[in-house]
């Protein structure tokens, strides 16, 4: 029976976290673009979380 070696487990976890980070960065950039293009005049710029970074 093939068993999952620690190296392949680490590799699968790395691939999982890379895909999750890519997904969240894509959502963050699209949200940033939509917010800055549509709601710039409606909200103070100091309240937007991407200006804190």
Curated annotation (Swiss-Prot):
One of its GO terms (biological process) is ATP biosynthetic process. Signal peptide: none annotated. Its main location: mitochondrion. Keywords: ATP synthesis, CF(0), Hydrogen ion transport, Ion transport, Membrane, Mitochondrion, Transmembrane, Transmembrane helix, Transport. It is found in: Mitochondrion membrane. The chain crosses the membrane at residues 9-29. Mitochondrial membrane ATP synthase (F(1)F(0) ATP synthase or Complex V) produces ATP from ADP in the presence of a proton gradient across the membrane which is generated by electron transport complexes of the respiratory chain. F-type ATPases consist of two structural domains, F(1) - containing the extramembraneous catalytic core and F(0) - containing the membrane proton channel, linked together by a central stalk and a peripheral stalk. During catalysis, ATP synthesis in the catalytic domain of F(1) is coupled via a rotary mechanism of the central stalk subunits to proton translocation. This is ATP synthase protein 8. It comes from Lumbricus terrestris (Common earthworm). The gene is MT-ATP8.
């Amino acid at each position: 029976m093939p068993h999952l070696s620690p190296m392949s487990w680490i590799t699968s976890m790395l691939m999982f976290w890379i895909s999750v980070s890519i997904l969240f960065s894509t959502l963050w950039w699209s949200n940033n673009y939509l917010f800055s293009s549509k709601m710039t005049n409606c909200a103070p710029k100091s309240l937007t979380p991407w200006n804190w970074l």
